[in-house]
Regions:
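A translation/RNA-centric and nucleic-acid-associated enzymatic feature enriched
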Residues: 109, 180-337
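A general structural signal for short secondary-structure junctions and capping/turn motifs
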Residues: 68-70, 92-98, 118-120, 169, ...
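A glycine-rich phosphate-binding loop feature that marks nucleotide/adenosyl-phosphate handling sites
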Residues: 47-51, 165-172, 323-326
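Generic recognition of stable, solvent-exposed alpha-helical segments in well-folded globular domains
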Residues: 18-25, 29, 137-144, 148, ...
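Class II aminoacyl-tRNA synthetase-like tRNA-binding/catalytic domains
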Residues: 2-119, 127-131
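A generic secondary-structure signal for well-formed alpha-helical elements
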Residues: 30, 34-41, 149-160, 311
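Extended, charged alpha-beta segments that form solvent-exposed binding/catalytic grooves
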Residues: 104-192, 196
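Extracellular structured ligand-interaction cores
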Residues: 100-102, 123-127, 205-207, 249
């Protein structure tokens, strides 16, 4: 059963026809702007991966993957949950050099996702990855990339408002970003849950990049789960916006500088995942065979939601919803695709 919120007096800014046009516009403009800003090139992405490679994303380590066998090859395949690890391997395999990177249109199925206004079992995002030097593995470099992404969001929004005057009633986002660590957030709001801390901070400060996600805080608990084998927990984070219709913090992107051999070694042990050391991808990282990189995923439907002022992700993507969600949205005049 999903947990749906119906905002009071909500009306979609665009009709269904214009919504489809706007979605296409957002996806085209943002991808072009992001590529130009970060020096990225589009590559084709897999829909599923062989299970034995270890390239699929384990997310928080408890989500079940969609798995099936392939008759002719006799192998087991998994529908991707994200391409965080695959992209880094692809940078090497495709011959990318320092300062250049790739992006792809990633489509995933997350069967254990808890459905609500922001979460669907269908995930569509721009997955991107870029080769950096070892000297670039620092907060300053990470913050500069975050600012580039936010600038691309704002540029896309400006063009969208020019093409669809109906959207000019919505507030424009600014390129300003506030940076804060998970420990600073816990210190500021010790009596709130992690999600409540995000809501309180982003409501007050606007667009925020929340840094250092994965390792335990002084309370003994991490702010949120993070797989130990792609992001370096010291130089990663979530890009958060304020969702005005839902009055909550809203994650557009999870990203970070990727693990070095040393940080993967440390994080695998911290997470109790030492068994992964035998997998091909993990061996390659631990042996220093893959390039240093930075990367992340940027939600396509989430960006469309943000820029169209939508109240439910089902307004901008076609997915499967429970009967209660469909009935509540129909009653409130929220059209699900």
């Amino acid at each position: 059963m999903s947990k749906i919120i119906i905002p009071a007096n909500y009306t979609p800014a665009l009709n269904l026809y214009d919504t489809q046009r706007a979605i296409g516009t957002v996806k085209r403009l943002f991808a072009d702007t992001l590529c130009a800003t970060l020096n990225l090139y589009r590559v084709s992405a897999p829909l599923f991966l062989e299970a034995s490679t270890g390239l699929n994303d384990d997310l928080n380590g408890v989500e079940r993957k969609v798995t099936f066998d392939i008759k002719d090859s006799g192998t087991e395949a998994q529908v991707v949950q994200s391409l965080a690890k695959w992209k880094r391997q692809a940078l090497k395999d495709y011959g990318f050099r320092v300062g250049k990177g790739l992006y792809c249109d990633m489509n995933a199925i997350r069967r254990d996702e808890e459905l609500d206004n922001l979460h669907s079992v269908y995930v569509d995002q721009w997955d991107w990855e870029k080769i950096i030097t070892v000297e670039d593995r620092n907060e300053t470099y990470l913050k500069n990339v975050v600012r580039c992404i936010v600038s691309a969001v704002c540029a896309t929004e400006m063009n969208l408002h020019a093409m669809f005057p109906q959207l000019q009633e919505l507030p424009l986002h600014t390129p300003n970003v506030t940076f804060v660590t998970t420990q600073e957030l816990e210190d500021k709001y010790p009596d709130l849950t992690p999600k409540e801390r995000e809501n309180a901070f982003v409501k007050e400060n606007g667009t925020t990049f929340l840094m250092k996600i994965g390792a335990p805080l002084r309370s003994g608990k991490p702010h949120d789960g993070r797989a130990p084998d792609y992001d370096d927990w010291d130089v990663n984070g979530d890009l958060l916006f304020w969702n005005d219709p839902l009055q909550c913090s809203y994650e557009l992107s999870s990203m970070g500088i990727r693990v070095s051999p040393e940080s993967m070694d440390r994080q695998l042990t911290m997470a109790g995942c030492d068994d992964r050391r035998a997998l091909p991808f993990h061996k390659a990282v631990l042996n220093g065979e893959l390039p240093y990189s930075i990367g992340g995923g940027i939600g396509q439907s989430r960006l469309c939601m943000l820029l169209l002022g939508s109240a439910h992700i089902g307004e901008v993507q076609a997915s499967v919803w429970d009967a209660a969600t469909r009935e509540a949205c129909a009653k409130a005049g929220i059209p699900l695709l």
